[in-house]
Amino acid sequence: MFNQEQGTDYPVLNKKKLESLANLKLAMGGHEYPTDDLTQQGLKLAGPLLEEVEESEVNHTTAPIDARLQTFLNSYFAECGEEVPKIPDDTFILDREGLGRVLSFPPHKQEFFCETMKSYKIKQGVLHNPAKDKRTTVGVFHICQSDVPVPADKIECPKIAFLRMLKAAFYGAPDDHLIIPYTAECKEPTRSWVSLYMRPVVVPGVKGVKGFEHEKATEMHFFVPGNMVSCLDFVESVFGNAGNPRLSKNDAALDPLGWTGHSGMAILAPHLTRMTKKECGLPHISQATERQKRERMCWEKEDELYNDGKTFKMYCRDASGVICTIIADNYFGYCKKEVKTQISYSANLYGFAEEEHAGGAVTRPSYDLGEACKAVQYAEGYKFSEMVEKNKHSIIVKEEGYAVDKKYPEGIIYVPEDSVFTIEDASIKFNHNGKEESILLTPKVNYVLPNGYTIILHDTMTSRRWTLRGILPQYTLCHKPCTVSGGGKSEISKSIRDAVIEGSVFVNNKEEDFKAVQEIFDHDFSKRYANGEVKPIHILDPNVTLGTVVELLTPSHLFTKEHNDYISSISPLIVELVMTIKSLYREDWKGDWQSRITVDKINGNEGNELKYRGANLCSQYLRVGFERDETTWRVFQLRKDFFPAAKLQMEDDITASVIVPTKLLKTPINNMQKKACKIVKNCELRLFQRPDDAVFRGFDKQTEYDFSIPGHFISNYQPMTREEAKDFTKDVVRLYQYTEPMRKCLQDFVAGKDEAKYIVSSSYTRLVPEGDKLVGSKNPRYLQRRPDMLDPEYTYMTFKAIQLYRKISDEEPLYTPVDAVLSGRRNNPPQVAKNGMKLRPLSVFAPLHYFELPELLMECITSMTGASPSMFGAGSEGALTKGPFNSLPAVVDLNNYLLGMICCGYSGFVSSASYCGPHYKVAHDISLLIPEIWSKMRRYEQEPKYLIEHGYLEPCPDVTYNGKTYSGKRLGYRITTAFANHFLRTLFSMPNSVMPEDFLKPELQDLAIYADSYEYMSQTDKGIAMNYVKDGTVEGACPPLKALIYIMANGEYNGMTRESKEFREMFDPEVVLNSEWYKERLVTRQKLEVAKLNKDLAYLNKTIAEKPRLVETLNKQIAAVKEELQYVSSEEYLIDIDGSIGTDPYPYKCMKH
């Protein structure tokens, strides 16, 4: 269904066929359907067959998942003494991808309006604007009483209330909510529930590793009233479609090695906000418990509405592996987050794995290599012949001595290590069998050296039109977990390209400026070091890199005062000229650079714009935040060899990760010294993007391109008719601020070049009420196809380069685990929210901090955030930012996170978004910058120990204000001026100008605000920790986490404080991995898996007895399960999984039976 040519999805679906399928399914259910000739003819022919199907077993069989869910509900609510509602088995099942989109509109209408949604067919796909434009997390999450405690940050719901809500959801849905939009124009519209079956990933598979090789998914059945079918279109677009749940081939229990053993259900029922507390069975206030009074889960007046008539999500679950959810709203964010919640539930019960609120990307450094280069300097130690031998199954060797890729022969060409690339004659030359061979150098082709180093002829991001771009095979997988809303999860994987600005290179006076440049080239730099070391250097020496020149011209504590004074006296314009000439200079110029760099004559006088080979020379600049007025951009010149890092997105929001002992891997990874590593998988097929910067026309090029093509699912934008679009585009100046794709899309629509009635613009968000006026929504959204799926050749090339670099064959497994953990926080100065509430400042963070494990866990436990456009309010987002979406006690997630960090030996860094301190607004500029820096750092430079020893990280200082001292220990370490000068030189021409001292030290911006921020953070730490103590879930925390929570809440634990040596030793890897509680987790994982596999065998045998036709298929499954059972039951299994996180026994210990 994916159209590679158009770069989008749904246009390749045959709309007519899907409509015919919808008609057929309606007819089978005895419903009226919109008529068309094709369907009429088909139904006449298929009449007898339809009668047979109606009588068939499938039509009247309860889906296996529904049987599992019903068994759970009957057992769970047996004590209530009331009827348990039956899960509907006559729903309209979306068993084909795209069917939900067709059902969302009447076939001959361009819009559909109802109480909960306004929907439009637009030029770019579909636009759905739900009643609310964002979600809230305040008072929303309710959990039904069970053996597993309900955390204090959730509202506890009595079983009877959930049961009555469930009845009202299924039996009390208003008639108009049940109308399927597709049939809305029929005389008798179809009123029905619509459902979708999904199998979202929970545990990624690890190829070749026994016990970890099978990818495992949970199962979920999602029910919505008919007119909310667009919510299922949305969910399907993100998580996929697992087909008809009634069919045996789709029964998760018949795929036991690919199933976690867990099942879930979700029901949309916005009408439930009208139910009263009394109707739900909540007690009168005179009979209520203290918790019920505190949470308002009781009533005084009979007409009081449940949850005060506001949105809520209600869970019922225990540790048996079944979860059911009722959602009293239809905002898309709730639907997506519900699937996330159920993935998280399954991961926490299964073990080995985590569901993470994370973004991430494989990031490879990239450089401008100029107009010519020799491959030998980039592929030292690698031979073309050896590469060919190891890649027999994936490449075709040509007789001229090069090779092409079997899968992408036109886009990927493998060349020998002695290749010479030259743009001037568009050639790649190399020796083969004693003679020189030559092939044509063409754009957009990956020329791959034997070590995976990739060279591409490129025409953008350069100071001249054509250049050679080199991409290293060495990579860093930057993983951004525990990242708050608006903290930059998506940005870590976005190319920085969109943020780069280009401008011409100027001189004030050519003769004088060239003379100043030559003086720098002739300057004696040998005595620059303060320690007296003599190191002669000549800038134009071909052995001197551009990075060395940047270092040479950047003030440093390593240099003498005289040298620092000298380079500080050089004007930025002259520095830019020096860098420009250095980047262009070739050895055969023999020192004569002045004749090659020219200016035009204008009106008889020399101009100011420099040219090379007749083309204007360009410089590139990058924004890093705003000045204090919050409108003036802080823009800095990039190095002349700058190219954005080559990024491959691995995560965006919902990540399934598994921690695997390194000893089990079949091939090497970046760091074999660690006990374990984390392997991640993106659970989403499409990404629910919020393109904040698209409101600035022309800035977000990717969004503007996406909005120029059809097939998208869009929300919270303002629809425009052709007339409205005509008025919108009359402002020609602003129209031409868009990039060409968006501008042309609008112009084509206005010109009537298509049948669409509506269009949206990427900068024109939905108008929503704010007080007495309408303003643009701050939460515009659209579903973007995953970049790695949009460009499969680039994805393939990324992993191929890594495989070649590691010298492993094309048949061996390739592992790309996480290398760096870089979480994100969203900061803010003191603010007043739209509802008038004052938001306290969160202004203590520098651009980047490093935390030792206790302080990192404190960050993760509270997950504080400033205001975000995604939701209402600010404050704590709960443990690991998953508070609102965790149906089990958060200590389970925190235990897993802590163990994962220890097993894998990861270091915890946290970057800033929105603000650095109260006065430097940075938006997502830091989020984009960090992966660029990290990709260019050597592996040892990424280690905190090295950074601290070399002065690149410093402990945050204690700060005193109004006689009170605030300990810097809570804030860990932060980057220094030395870090900025040293590591930013890989990106910027003048790195010392990018991050001034008060940018790196927020207390210098405003001490009062800094102190208030610290107070706010301390109070939140204490308050959140007290919740774990009050609800008793602290007892489920592993020993170091338990001690930390008590210290956060009370200041000490068993005589230990956060500074105590014995407390900090509790986090020592050797202590943790040799502890009894860790060993118990491994045994728990073994016991659970043995029990599950035995249950699987019983189900398979039962199914064979009931359905003999499946005997051949199921016998294979039985053999595989028996083999797995034998291994899992062995002592070998316990030894093998040592280094994994095992399974947390806490939820199971809570169960009373």
Curated annotation (Swiss-Prot):
Coiled coil ranges (UniProt) are 1085-1131
Q: Does the keyword Repressor apply?
A: no
Q: Name one GO biological process term.
A: protein heterotrimerization
Q: Where in the cell is it found?
A: Cytoplasm, Cytosol
Reaction(s) the record says it catalyses: oxaloacetate + diphosphate = phosphoenolpyruvate + phosphate + CO2
GO terms under cellular component: cytosol
Query: Does this entry carry the keyword Magnesium?
Result: no
Q: Which GO terms describe its molecular function?
A: phosphoenolpyruvate carboxykinase (diphosphate) activity
Identify the keywords attached in UniProt to this record, alphabetized: Coiled coil, Cytoplasm, Decarboxylase, Lyase
The disulfides recorded in the entry are: none
Highest rank taxon of the organism = Eukaryota
EC number(s) for this protein? Answer: 4.1.1.38
UniProt subunit comment? Monomer and trimer; forms heterotrimers with PEPCK1 and PEPCK3.
The free-text function statement in the UniProt record for this protein reads: Inorganic pyrophosphate (PPi)-dependent phosphoenolpyruvate carboxykinase, which regulates the carbon flow of the central metabolism by fixing CO(2) to phosphoenolpyruvate to produce oxaloacetate. Can also produce pyruvate and diphosphate from phosphoenolpyruvate and phosphate.
Family per similarity comment:
Belongs to the PPi-type phosphoenolpyruvate carboxykinase family.
Protein's recorded name: PPi-type phosphoenolpyruvate carboxykinase 2
Gene (UniProt): PEPCK2
